[in-house]
């Protein structure tokens, strides 16, 4: 081999070596962030497969019926598990009746999670009924509930990353119950594996599901029985929502007026991408309400994963260029940064104020916007609208109770299981990082 050829070969090998080192450094940074989040979140276990029907409702408990449209794969291997985190072809449907403990036995705004396989209906959330249904059966039940709803409104909930099917159901049941919203609860649940280290899989599952969410929204706005639709999305669920709305707007030259409000809680979306999404949706759209917190540690981790690009849910709305962007796009922003949270990651602040859940949920679902003077929200919550961007500060907590956060005391998996998501090459690095953090 010539001297020149040897030099070129050495250069290529050096380049590959640098790339390999770079990947290892990236994995190490990500792993350190994950280990830190695991430490912050504590060591509590995580209940699973608790959608086992009791077949009865106990005195003093409340019943919430949840219709679910899902792109998850059907699961029949374990009792209490209707759908897995794998991807299905097309939309599937389920109907679940959730029992919520008496007010004297629970703190509103929280989910009283049962033990795996069941629970005590007097102190924990339990399942009265749970079954997979076909499209026609789902429609029959949807219309029956819509007829019983005074304003024929629908509340669509899109959960975030690291959320199992049963967790999404219980969290949405809590939202619907505590908000006391006169609307039919409709859950759109996409194939999240419910694992901390399945972040990239979940993101691709979100992309996989945007057409299906659009199909659900198209059905709602075109059906004459439906009066109004409110959308509530959290974390990565905002990505699915914004993509579906973007597609709808491009297809129909705007968003149908039946979609009254869109609430975006802690969006895990790149700021620049969000700006383009909003621009693509255009002016013919419903009001957007954005809930942010600059001390959101989960979104700080996401920022690092995505190359230090700011996430919409953690920006300072009073700073440029965000202030001007929100003003231009007429987006109302609720800044929750100064609010205390029982969530060590500050990613689930929305579950801390049940009173606000009730006020916001009730007013929006009944057809009034958050800035409607008839709603009296300013007096009730101490809201003050400041600046052209419509950034909202508050004295009381704002809450639109989110689904299971990126991770909390109940959402930890065994490390040996989760680290398989990143591959064996990072296990050694993780072991070296987690051990000292847990001491």
Model-derived features with residue positions:
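C-terminal motif of bacterial Sec signal peptides marking the signal peptidase cleavage site
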Residues: 39-42
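Short substrate-entry loop that stabilizes the transition state in hydrolases
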Residues: 164-168
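Gly/Ala-rich beta-loop-alpha elbow adjacent to hydrolase catalytic centers
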Residues: 233, 237, 241
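Bacterial N-terminal signal peptides that target proteins for export
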Residues: 5-31
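The conserved beta1-alpha1 loop
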Residues: 156-160, 266
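Lipolytic serine-hydrolase domain surface
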Residues: 44, 48-129, 140-149, 169-173, ...
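Long, low-complexity, intrinsically disordered segments
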Residues: 422-439
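Alpha/beta-hydrolase fold active-site loops
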Residues: 153
């Amino acid at each position: 081999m010539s001297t020149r050829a040897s030099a070129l070969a050495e250069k290529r090998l050096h380049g590959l070596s640098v790339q390999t080192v770079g990947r290892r450094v990236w994995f190490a940074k990500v792993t350190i962030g994950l280990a830190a989040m695991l430490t912050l979140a504590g060591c509590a276990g995580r209940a699973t497969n608790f959608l086992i029907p009791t077949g009865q409702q106990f005195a003093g408990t409340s019943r919430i019926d949840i219709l679910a449209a899902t792109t998850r794969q059907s699961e029949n291997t374990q009792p209490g598990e209707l759908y897995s985190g794998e991807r299905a072809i097309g939309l599937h449907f389920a109907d679940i009746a959730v029992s919520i403990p008496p007010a004297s036995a629970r703190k509103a705004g929280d989910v009283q999670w049962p033990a795996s396989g069941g629970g005590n209906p007097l102190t924990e959330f339990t399942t009265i009924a749970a079954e997979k249904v076909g499209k026609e059966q789902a429609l029959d039940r949807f219309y029956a509930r819509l007829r019983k709803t005074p304003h024929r409104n629908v509340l669509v909930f899109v959960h975030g990353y690291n959320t199992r099917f049963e967790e999404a159901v219980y969290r949405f049941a809590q939202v619907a119950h505590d908000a006391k919203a006169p609307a039919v609860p409709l859950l759109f649940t996409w194939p999240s594996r419910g694992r901390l280290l399945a972040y990239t899989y979940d993101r691709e599952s979100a992309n996989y599901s945007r057409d299906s969410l659009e199909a659900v929204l198209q059905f709602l706005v075109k059906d004459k029985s439906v009066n109004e639709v409110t959308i509530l999305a959290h974390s990565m669920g905002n990505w699915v929502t914004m993509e579906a709305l973007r597609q709808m707007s491009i297809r129909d030259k705007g968003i149908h007026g039946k979609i009254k409000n869109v609430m975006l809680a802690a969006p895990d979306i790149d700021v620049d991408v969000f700006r383009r999404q909003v621009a693509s949706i255009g002016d013919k759209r419903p009001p957007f309400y954005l809930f942010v917190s600059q001390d959101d540690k989960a979104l700080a981790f996401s920022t690092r994963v995505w190359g230090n690009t700011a996430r919409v849910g953690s920006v300072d709305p009073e700073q440029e260029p965000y202030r001007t962007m929100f003003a231009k796009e007429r987006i109302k922003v609720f800044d929750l940064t100064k609010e205390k949270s029982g969530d060590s990651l500050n990613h689930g602040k929305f579950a801390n104020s049940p009173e606000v859940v009730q006020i916001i949920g009730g007013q929006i679902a009944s057809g009034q916007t958050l800035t409607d003077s008839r709603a009296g929200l300013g007096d009730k919550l101490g809201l003050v609208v400041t600046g052209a961007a419509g950034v909202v500060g508050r004295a009381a907590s704002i809450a639109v109770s989110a689904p299971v956060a990126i991770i909390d005391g109940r959402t930890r998996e065994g490390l040996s299981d989760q680290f398989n998501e990143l591959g064996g090459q990072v296990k050694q690095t993780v072991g070296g990082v987690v051990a000292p953090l847990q001491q």
